[in-house]
Amino acid sequence: MSELHNPDQSSRALFDLCRVLLKGIYGELSAVLVGSLLDYGRQTAAELAKTTKLPLSAVHSGLAALVQNRFVLYWANDRKSGRDTDDIGESSSIHYVANWKEIYQVVRAGGMVDAVRKDFGKGPGGKSNPESGERCAEIAQNLLVYGHMRVADYLEATPEHDRDSVEASIAVMLRKRFLVPVQAWQFKPETDLYARMFRDHLSKLPLSMAESARKNQAAVSAKTELERMQEERNSLNLGFVSGSVARTKGVPVLNRAEKLDHQAVLCANPDKFLVIARNEELAKLAEERCGKTAAEVYRQCLSKYVGRLHSCTQDTSPGAEFNITSMEIAKTIDPRLDGLRPRGKGSRSVSPRPQSKRVKTEEGYTKTGDYDEKEVDVEEDMEEELSGVALATAVSKQMQILAASPLKFVQSVGTKGGGEWYVNFKEATECLRGARYEQIIQWKYGRVAKRLLRAVKDKGKVDEKLLTNIALLPVKEILNHLHDLHSVGALDVQELPRTADRAASRTIFLWHHRANRAYSLISQDIYKSLSRCFERVAAERAKLPILLSKLQREDVKGHEDEFLTEQEKADLKGLRMREEKLLVQMNRLDGLIRVFRDY
């Protein structure tokens, strides 16, 4: 169960980032309300009005918009009985809690829209379909802006001539889980849901049981019920009026006759975006370590999991549902890729088209003989079939390279279909985190510091003398790097005094690496960098208030060349360039947050 106020993840730097995000996009009121909830915890509307010194009407107005986007969650209690209630009325006391996870998704809104545009911009056979991509991207963007929306309301606001195509796009996005239905429990804190389930299960257990046994059993039952409720959200039937979903070899097969439920309330699914982003990040790491050919093969392998996984936290295990064969990869990969061209029997390069025989005439070899066209066609068909097998063999060789890597990209689990492979995402992402952290250490402190960090990770706990032998460097130089690594939390030191006076000369210092602590500390630095980037964007825009207000005029939109002066065009170009650089930097920083926190 995830916690809204986990001390390892919810920090002052993250809270400051949430304020900056809301202030820049949703206004000062939203930032003040969420800031108060982050600082003081759950509060009622009256308590918020008191802590923020805002009118109660303004607090209610701001909370309505925040709850719609699930930036703020609520929990209702009956004032008389004090019990939890789902019926909100005059006798209800409603408490509000800030949901920093949804607030942070604002950073990724642009990336999610681009992912939708890229995925749906490809038609059958890999052909480009930009119209479909733009239409689906617009749907995703609108849902990200408004938080959630009923299908009937969205279609009603759509021009009549576009409704059929928009409805079809929504249905496809729902089938692929880029959109998911919103359920009532998603507007409530998980901690409160768990507490209510725990009390319900505890009250049903007999009092004859030991108190500790009753609490343990109630906790297990509550956790199971909460997980089951969350899993129901991933049901492929949700959002459709009728029809069933069959499964073949663990892969969902969707009934195209199903009708979209116009009363369903939908929202964008950030978990699907994380699955796609994780695949791309793993493929980039494979390219760095194993080459472009192996990385492209790995990218195709990972793409097979997109339809089988609904989130990065989903448990997987080797089996028919999550095993990928070399033949499956060979069907979608480009056979012209360097390193995959078949060699040997079955290859066109080795088995060329039969040459025409020259016929001897009275004047010499002047004419060419004919050959049987049917025989050549049969041979070419055999070559095509053999080339498919040879391609699968070449794919299998690249997968073996990935399986042999110490970064645990993939595991070999069988020989079916030219070779069966399974990606253990937990191990692969843990190796990804370690590799990216070492990369950051190298950027900041150099290769020697990275080498020392690797040595400590391999050996567990080591002292300076052992590190000197491993790194082949003098003690003084090693100590300087160790102190740098200790200052950023990459290494911790344990003191083992050999005497009671704890003298430094008689103390053994053991250096070790705690991965979770190191990743948490580096995440705080990244949050601070993201906050500064957003503040810098706001500061750059504040320098040109008149120009930006002019761009908002209806007569200027789309006619900038006509209404803007040369100086204004130059200022606008400079602003766009600075914004682009900052946005690229923010995207890279968010990529690191995904690696260290979300995968």
Curated annotation (Swiss-Prot):
Annotated GO molecular function terms are:
single-stranded DNA binding
Point to the regions of Basic and acidic residues compositional bias.
359-371
Q: Entry's Pfam families?
A: HTH_9, POLR3C_WHD, RNA_pol_Rpc82
InterPro entries xref list: POLR3C_WHD, RNA_pol_III_RPC82-rel_HTH, RNA_pol_III_Rpc82_C, RPC3, WH-like_DNA-bd_sf
Q: Where in the cell is it found?
A: Nucleus
What UniProt keywords are attached to this protein's entry?
A: DNA-directed RNA polymerase, Nucleus, Transcription, Zinc
| Renumbered residue ranges of the record's region Leucine-zipper | 526-547
- Is Zinc one of the keywords? yes
Where is the region Disordered? 335-371
Question: Which GO terms are recorded in the biological process aspect for this UniProt protein?
Answer: DNA-templated transcription
Function, as annotated, reads: DNA-dependent RNA polymerase catalyzes the transcription of DNA into RNA using the four ribonucleoside triphosphates as substrates. Specific core component of RNA polymerase III which synthesizes small RNAs, such as 5S rRNA and tRNAs.
**What family does the database annotate?**
Belongs to the RNA polymerase beta chain family.
Record note on quaternary structure: Component of the RNA polymerase III (Pol III) complex consisting of 17 subunits.
Q: What is this protein called?
A: DNA-directed RNA polymerase III subunit RPC3
Gene symbol here is RPC82
